């Protein structure tokens, strides 16, 4: 065989080998593309709601002391040189988070003990606001209104005003767009403290970037909303927007009083269905409900999540929003609250858009910020869904 013939044979074999290699690569690419398409389709089907808005949310009802997770508690203790009851994350979780089978309000309230201990200094309060805000930002929250009761942070000598100033400092140190709501508390012998909270709210009130509203929280069944008429008359006189916890431990009548006082938002409002007239009043006045499913299940406001009325209210045209309440104690996130509504009620992307739109419209902030939030959340887009 000549050198030329040998060269030609080698070239033929190489061309054949190349064709086989190319063919094999094409087959592999085709298989990979098919698998990738299937995986993407499955992922989209499983989480099309999250994809619709890139996992971005608004939390209007979030208590600072109820949002202290294990990592945050450990950081607050280290910063202040405090000793926690255990070094074990697993054991600390038991102190901070209610068990899945929470059977009593005492089990729930016990989880506030360590956060209350950690939030009695300006440093602790400042860092708590910053850490909680950073934490929820990492979970997809783009705007939040963090509420706390200044009178709960005076046990070690800090004044209500110093507590507010510390919280404002923490707000400045986070990149999350957030505001503060100051809570007055239901109870005995604290009228002066509540009045001071209202006066300080007026002093520090801004349209955005600080204190934007006041609230009334605490044992609703023991201390009826109707008892606080004068307190909120003063808030109205001073031009302070307010939300009131109502329709949670007490029934629909509590919500009626809150609306009569001038509340534009109701914390929870779960039980308005008990009185059709109150349902009609909520719709007529355009009042927004701040609903918190996991919280309401754990405090036994509802017996079963399948009975939760959020979707019924949404379908009835009531302005409802989805929130966390006490995310650290409940072991939840706002993304998880949306997933729960998907699981139990087949929440659609369009319904999520409505919930987020309601949250933007009800937020205690400026129109400019609301427009920014609408843009971030793509609320003007039409969401297509094949869900039934």
Task: Tell where the protein language model's regions lie, with residue ranges.
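N-terminal secretory signal peptides that target proteins for export/translocation
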Residues: 1-18
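Detector for intrinsically disordered, low-structure N-terminal pre-sequences
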Residues: 13, 26-28, 43
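Bacterial N-terminal signal peptides
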Residues: 25-38
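Metal-cofactor-binding active-site regions of metalloenzymes
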Residues: 39, 43-240, 249-254, 260, ...
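Conserved hydrophobic beta-strand within the GNAT/NAT acetyltransferase core sheet
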Residues: 242-244
């Amino acid at each position: 065989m000549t050198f030329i013939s040998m060269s030609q044979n080698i070239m033929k074999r190489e061309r054949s080998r190349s064709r086989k290699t190319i063919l094999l690569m094409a087959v592999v690419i085709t298989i990979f593309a098919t698998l990738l398409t299937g995986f993407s389709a499955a992922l989209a089907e499983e989480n099309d709601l999250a994809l619709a808005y890139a996992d971005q949310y608004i939390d209007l009802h979030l208590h600072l002391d109820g949002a202290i997770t294990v990592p945050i508690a450990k950081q607050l203790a280290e910063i202040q040189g405090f000793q926690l009851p255990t070094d074990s994350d697993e054991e600390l979780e038991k102190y901070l988070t209610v068990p899945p089978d929470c059977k009593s309000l005492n089990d729930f309230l016990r989880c506030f003990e360590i956060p209350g201990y950690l939030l009695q200094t300006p440093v602790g309060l400042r860092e708590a606001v910053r850490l909680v805000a950073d934490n929820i930002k990492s979970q997809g929250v783009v705007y939040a209104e963090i509420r706390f009761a200044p009178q709960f942070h005076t046990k070690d000598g800090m004044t209500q005003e110093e507590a507010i100033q510390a919280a404002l400092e923490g707000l400045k140190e986070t990149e999350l767009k957030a505001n503060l709501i100051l809570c007055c508390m239901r109870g005995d012998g604290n009228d002066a403290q509540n009045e001071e909270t209202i006066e300080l709210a007026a002093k520090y009130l801004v349209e955005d970037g600080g204190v934007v509203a006041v609230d009334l929280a605490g044992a609703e069944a023991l201390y009826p909303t109707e008892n606080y008429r004068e307190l909120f008359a003063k808030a109205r006189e001073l031009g302070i927007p307010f939300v009131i916890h109502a329709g949670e431990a007490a029934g629909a009548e509590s919500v009626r009083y809150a609306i009569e006082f001038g509340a534009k938002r109701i914390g929870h409002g779960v039980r308005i269905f008990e009185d059709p007239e109150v349902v009609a009043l909520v719709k007529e006045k355009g009042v927004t409900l701040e609903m918190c499913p996991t919280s309401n299940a754990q405090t036994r406001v509802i017996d079963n999540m399948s009975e939760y009325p959020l979707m019924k209210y949404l379908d009835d045209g009531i302005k409802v929003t989805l929130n966390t309440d006490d995310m650290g104690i409940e072991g939840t996130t706002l993304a998880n609250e949306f997933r729960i509504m998907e699981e139990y009620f087949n929440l659609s992307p369009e319904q999520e858009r409505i919930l987020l739109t309601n949250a933007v419209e009800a937020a205690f902030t400026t129109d400019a910020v609301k427009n920014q939030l609408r843009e971030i959340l793509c609320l003007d887009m039409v969401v297509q869904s094949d869900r039934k």
